[in-house]
Amino acid sequence: MSSLSVYHVSSPDLPNKVLTHFDDIAATLAEQGIRFDRWPATTRVAPGTSQQEVICAYQEQVDRLMTEGGYASVDVISLDEDHPRKAELRASFLDEHRHSEDEVRFFVAGRGLFNLHIDDYVYAVLCERNDLISVPAGTAHWFDMGERPNLVAIRMFNNPQGWNASLTGDAIASQFPRLDD
């Protein structure tokens, strides 16, 4: 089940609120300019499925999102616990970073924890299959796929080169719960 935990930066061990109803999650994130939506992930794909196979399986949704948002590139993160580079890939997302463009993730299998650092709050969004999250350019965030990843997410960007992050240098991400905590 998707959830949203909202923390003040001064209390990373105790959320101010925890939401589990889709409408409440979407409304709370919308107040911060974050789109959270449900899109049916009707084709079953397993973590480890190739990028080409995932995009082909979801071509209609990809085309719709690319047109709707004016996105220039699409890729897929598809990992299971047996992936040989899982620790390296996980580490690349765990530090707080920003993008100069919007980032959209459509979860078609598994789950991941998307943390958004906005002003004095951290919005920890547990995303699962059927969840779509759109993070505006410049929003500080980090992502945790867990020690034993199990996820397939389609990612879209305005930048034709795809995922390009700028680290903030803030160690805040290390203070907050991880996916497996």
From Swiss-Prot:
It holds the Pfam family ARD. It catalyses: 1,2-dihydroxy-5-(methylsulfanyl)pent-1-en-3-one + O2 = 3-(methylsulfanyl)propanoate + CO + formate + 2 H(+); 1,2-dihydroxy-5-(methylsulfanyl)pent-1-en-3-one + O2 = 4-methylsulfanyl-2-oxobutanoate + formate + 2 H(+). Disulfide bonds: none annotated. Fe(2+) binds at residues 97, 99, 103, 141. Pathway: Amino-acid biosynthesis; L-methionine biosynthesis via salvage pathway; L-methionine from S-methyl-5-thio-alpha-D-ribose 1-phosphate: step 5/6. Ni(2+) binds at residues 97, 99, 103, 141. The keyword ATP-binding does not apply. The record marks 105 as: Important to generate the dianion. Keywords: Amino-acid biosynthesis, Dioxygenase, Iron, Metal-binding, Methionine biosynthesis, Nickel, Oxidoreductase. Binds 1 Fe(2+) cation per monomer. Binds 1 nickel ion per monomer. The record marks 102 as: May play a role in transmitting local conformational changes. Its EC number is 1.13.11.54, 1.13.11.53. Gene3D superfamilies: Jelly Rolls. Its cofactor is Fe(2+); Ni(2+). The keyword Membrane does not apply. One of its GO terms (biological process) is L-methionine salvage from methylthioadenosine. The record marks 96 as: May play a role in metal incorporation in vivo. InterPro entries: ARD, ARD_bac, RmlC-like_jellyroll, RmlC_Cupin_sf. HAMAP family: Salvage_MtnD. Belongs to the acireductone dioxygenase (ARD) family. Catalyzes 2 different reactions between oxygen and the acireductone 1,2-dihydroxy-3-keto-5-methylthiopentene (DHK-MTPene) depending upon the metal bound in the active site. Fe-containing acireductone dioxygenase (Fe-ARD) produces formate and 2-keto-4-methylthiobutyrate (KMTB), the alpha-ketoacid precursor of methionine in the methionine recycle pathway. Ni-containing acireductone dioxygenase (Ni-ARD) produces methylthiopropionate, carbon monoxide and formate, and does not lie on the methionine recycle pathway. This is Acireductone dioxygenase. It comes from Pseudomonas fluorescens (strain ATCC BAA-477 / NRRL B-23932 / Pf-5).
